[in-house]
Swiss-Prot record:
It comes from Syntrophobacter fumaroxidans (strain DSM 10017 / MPOB). Keywords: Coiled coil, DNA-binding, Transcription, Transcription regulation. The gene is greA. Residues 44-67 form a coiled coil. This is Transcription elongation factor GreA. GO terms for molecular function: DNA binding; RNA polymerase binding.
Length: 156
């Protein structure tokens, strides 16, 4: 199975979340379940049901994080400034139709978050940007439709 690229920072964020869930959230929900059980009949105990649901969500997220972390390969962004967009690069682009300028950091799929300015190298835009140089124009199909993009700046 191919490894999933991730930055060192992205892997650390996954690790911190996993530790928080295991160290803080899991024991807290176990105590809540025990407390709800102590109230007697659990068949009609809303507190018990809510705690069990929360426990299932926490355990599911822990399992998800463990799986993702096992699939990851930490990739250090290259210091090779060949002028092309690569994994870890920050790319400033302009939508040639709207004039909107946006900055994206190219990262792995497990750390991508458009709201914080990171996009996955396997997303349509991420794939289109990999290997491009400043001044190049690309046409890319996105969920919002076809966009014409000019690469303004690349920082590796």
């Amino acid at each position: 199975m191919p490894r999933v690229p991730i930055t060192k920072e992205g892997f650390e964020r996954l690790k911190i979340e996993l530790q928080r869930l295991q160290r803080d959230e899991r024991p807290m929900v176990i105590r809540a379940i025990e407390e709800a059980r102590s109230h007697g009949d659990i068949s009609e105990n809303a507190e018990y049901e809510a705690a069990k649901e929360k426990q299932a969500m926490i355990e599911g997220r822990i399992q998800d994080l463990c799986q993702k972390m096992g699939e990851c390969e930490i990739v250090e962004p290259s210091d090779n400034d060949n002028g092309r967009a690569i994994f870890g690069s920050t790319v400033v682009v302009e939508d040639t139709e709207t004039g909107e300028v946006t900055s994206y950091r190219l990262v792995g799929p497990y750390e991508a978050d458009v709201q914080s300015g990171t996009i996955s190298v396997v997303s349509p835009l991420g794939k289109a940007l990999i290997g491009k140089e400043e001044g190049e124009e690309i046409r890319v199909q996105t969920p919002k439709g076809v966009r014409n993009i000019e690469v303004l700046e690349i920082r590796n």
